[in-house]
């Protein structure tokens, strides 16, 4: 069975790709460039992950319209990337409005064309930044949209195997699957060394710290988040 895996280049999508591969799916990898600050680093990570897992069918999509729409510190240089606050429940400035719906729509289109029956995405609800499009209820609803908006014989279904996990559990899962964490990139701000201070860096560093492992990528600073 064929599956499309959305691979941003980050830790979560890396682990999801490894999970889908371990389940025996023939993988087709999709990466979306949407004008994010670290697009070059993320694209490099995507290509390295695909090479590591010998994924031959790849699609790199240009979604520059999300940059033109703006409204996020990831796509608008006039909005600063906030320093992490792991205690807040507020949606941070890094939220890209309705981004995952755009990504999933493209993944569904491609799945129909290539005959994929599953779409894997590394969404995390339990230990995420509070993004509304990372909730299980959102993906349940989107599966209904797929059912209503595709050909009658289509059997495409979104899978979110990390949705209920903590970030530290995702690290453990990655260790079990022997994933190349050193190929992944999570920083929202920097394309050199990871900043260590943005929300994504903080959650990643905390996860590794909770597991008692060193994150193999380079950081400008490595605060203690536990």
Swiss-Prot record:
Pfam families: QueC (PF06508)
Any one GO MF annotation of this record: zinc ion binding
Span of the signal peptide: none
Enzyme class (EC, first level): ligase
Known pathway: Purine metabolism; 7-cyano-7-deazaguanine biosynthesis
Source organism, top-level taxon: Bacteria
Binding site for ATP: 7-17
Reaction it catalyzes: 7-carboxy-7-deazaguanine + NH4(+) + ATP = 7-cyano-7-deazaguanine + ADP + phosphate + H2O + H(+)
Cofactor: Zn(2+)
EC number(s) stated in the UniProt entry for this protein: 6.3.4.20
Keywords (A to Z) from UniProt: ATP-binding, Ligase, Metal-binding, Nucleotide-binding, Queuosine biosynthesis, Zinc
GO biological process per UniProt: queuosine biosynthetic process
InterPro entries: QueC, Rossmann-like_a/b/a_fold
Binding site for Zn(2+): 187, 195, 198, 201
Textual note on the cofactor: Binds 1 zinc ion per subunit.
UniProt similarity note: Belongs to the QueC family.
NCBIfam families hit by this protein: 7-cyano-7-deazaguanine synthase QueC (TIGR00364)
Function, in words: Catalyzes the ATP-dependent conversion of 7-carboxy-7-deazaguanine (CDG) to 7-cyano-7-deazaguanine (preQ(0)).
Protein name: 7-cyano-7-deazaguanine synthase
